[in-house]
Amino acid sequence: YSSENNFYTAVKNEYPEFLEKNKIESSLNLFYVAAYLFGNDYRFSRPHIASQAFPDMELTNINIARFFVADRPELYYWELAQISQKAGWTNGTFTIILNAVEEDYIKVDLNRYIHKSLFSVAPDAIDSIRHQLEKLVGDSGYYGIFAIFNYDGFPLIDYEWNEHLLQSIIENYDLGFKLLEPTVKDRRYKKGIIVPQSNPCQSFEEFVIAQMKIDGITSIAKDAFSGYLRRKGLVLTATIPIELYDGDGLRLEGNNFVFG
């Protein structure tokens, strides 16, 4: 197996004259040249290259991820980062691979993953978690996962409570709740809004617009909007999520955010 980046680096080190003669200046160019020349001997699916001896699988990101982690019972972020560096994946490919890994694993904290087949929460604990979420969401109909600083009300389980574990449980168990997250994510912090599963909003932007409609707001100055989002408990910091600047329904016109 090789990524296109590692392949390009190897060719650049061993056969620089070949790249220069054929005016190949990027891993992308070389990938397609190699696919044309060696398509019968190797398998190519950007950014992955595999020999015929590589396990017989479609070269998708999820399959490549599963090959490298090999169903380990427990994974750490640093291990995945190490695999990525050795494989020569770009940051973008690593992010895609990381998301693929999370289809098979439960993220229990910032750096640790447990295979789904080995992770469980007792039914009575699930009921207790559901009850606690109902209390948090309360009359407002939502609660920012980033605003939970104390987990004393949550049941004692085999893992230490944190926002990553809570999000994993919400996403993998039938609690009657879902998370609406800003499009641009940061793996270090959770920015989602917990809402009942029955809430009609399908995106963070839709939910923000719904709150503005409730408050009778159709236009609001940029500086005031930042404060509004924080007062409503929709964000933790003063930074306005990027998708609100030019979304499907909400956008920045001049110095004002408007929708409709």
Report the location of each language-model feature.
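C-terminal non-catalytic scaffold/interaction domains in large multidomain proteins
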Residues: 1-260
